[in-house]
Amino acid sequence: TLLLTTSGKVLASGLNVYGQTSNAEGKTNKFEEIKLNELIGKISAGDNHSVLLTTKGEIYTFGYNVKGQLGNGNNKNTNIPTKVSGIRDIMDISAGKNQTIILSSNKILYSTGSNEQGELGIGTDENKVLFTQIKTIDNMMSISSGNTYNVAIRYDGEVYAWGDYYHGIQNIKTKTNSRIPVKIGNDSSYANEKEITLNVNSSKQIEITPKYTFNVFKEDEMYNDFSYETINEEIAKVNAKGTITGQKVGTTWVK
């Protein structure tokens, strides 16, 4: 866990097997300050790596680096926050499971690390050890990374997603992993279909549009008794048979 103080200092606690808390010990059960002669404006913690954005627009990375998620040109883990050379004028950062996405002041996105699910958004499945421009979108305002997927917002309000479809970007038309950013729109939501399928113990995000009622089916025949629920019943309710009825337009999870 990383904490950012109002004075621009960073505190870290937790598992440190790969150096992700910048502590010499294997783990720490209390928050300790990360010694860095910089003022930090933003922080982001991935699965086992950490990213810091200074008030100068530079970034420091440390922790697990087998996939290249630190963006420093190699695959070596480090417990020392290290400035990424050649990277400046950054305004936003986001660390996913094994990928890091950054947003520059000229509204361009760059990515590094694991790309097995297309999470770098560069059109290939090749991992990167240096930050690489995502060339198919621009004029970006913010970025947020999930486990193996990412979502970004443009200044015009459009939302784009890419990466792992089955564990993240489940309201795009292709219904497969996407290696480039794909625009998310209401016309691609689950609520515009007559049914969706859930495996037992799985969940999916649904977007309720004016087409309010549709059915949910669970695939695993080993289970005789199914139960269904939605996270936000103000958006949608679900009965024992799996029929979801929307209450108002919005987004919720069904499982």
Region spans (language model):
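Extracytoplasmic soluble-region selector
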Residues: 186-255
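Eukaryote-biased RCC1-like beta-propeller repeat architecture
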Residues: 1-195, 208-213
